[in-house]
Amino acid sequence: LGLAKGKIQMKIAIASDLHLEFGDLDIQNTDGADVLLLSGDICVAADLDMRDRRQTEMGFARWRSEMFHGFFERCATNFPHVIYVMGNHEYYHSDFATALGDMRRKLAHLPNLYILEREIKVIDDVTFIGGTLWTDMNNQDDLTMYHMRTMMNDFRVIQHSAVPVNFRTSEGEFKTRVAKFSPEDAVTEHVKMKEYIQVVTDMLGKNPNRYVVVGHHSPSRRSTHAMYANDTIMNGGYSSDLDEFIENRPQIKLWTHGHTHHEFDYVIGETRVVCNPRGYIGHEPQADKWKLKTVEI
């Protein structure tokens, strides 16, 4: 993982699963990082209002929106660049088809904050590839998808207007409703993101740039806490086995993720995999002691 000749080291600060809906956070750039990576589950997008509505009707919902805006504005002030990917919680109580665009509009006044979804951002000689990733549900296992559909909030509280559902009422009338985001949708999104990473790193990989993948769901089973090691089905909603995929792409020097509320830092081939989640402040012990993590590539 040594630095190639002629490369300038870049300092990258890493955070995920800050869950500001449980409590605010002030991130300071004490290490002089060049880039802050926010690997998802930072806030609930439905609770973030447009900037021009911030000064009206300061009830609880408005207060929460003001807190979220304040956090992102401090990050954009304290760090030269902020790269942000949506986690699953960003989509809660929203429409999967429109939430990403809504989030971008609400934060458009911050020119150095980049929300990526199957997109890249090049900073100096580092290409950042961003997207939620989701999972392959244990390689599209039917039992895993059945359990995830009934057990995970993702598939109960996220709408998906791009997928209409036709149904018949008890009176025999045919109607259409908006579908819920489904495990099958998650697999589709996972495949798209994996293919995008493959295209970027394989087709553009001959250039001298280093690559960093910023995701939310884990790309490796190694990001599974020992206490959940035997929960094979449930783990399918948290991680995918992309170890070989990563090993075959040594140009990826760093891969960040969140989703699990346990810290991880390990190496697959030439790639450092880092997860630095805060979790639910006031509900999880590690959240009260959380610190920003800075690495160099």
Residue ranges of model-derived segments:
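N-terminal active-site segment of His-dependent metallophosphoesterases
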Residues: G2-Y84, Y91-T98
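Beta-strand-turn-beta hairpins that frame and shape the catalytic cleft
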Residues: I8-I12, I120-G130, R210, V267-R272
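Active-site neighborhood of phospho(di)ester-bond hydrolases with catalytic His/Asp-centered motifs
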Residues: I14-S16, L36-D41, I83-N88, Y114-R118, ...
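Active-site environment of divalent metal-dependent phosphoester hydrolases
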Residues: H19-L25, C43-D47, H89-A99, I120-V122, ...
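Short amphipathic alpha-helices and their capping/turn segments at secondary-structure boundaries
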Residues: D24-D31, G70-A76, I115-D124, I129, ...
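A basic- and aromatic-enriched beta-loop-alpha substructure that forms the phosphate/nucleotide-
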Residues: H81-M152
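Binuclear metal-dependent phosphoesterase catalytic core
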Residues: V122, H225, N230, M234-K253, ...
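Active-site-proximal loop/helix segment associated with metal-binding centers of metalloenzymes
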Residues: I129-V212, H217-A229
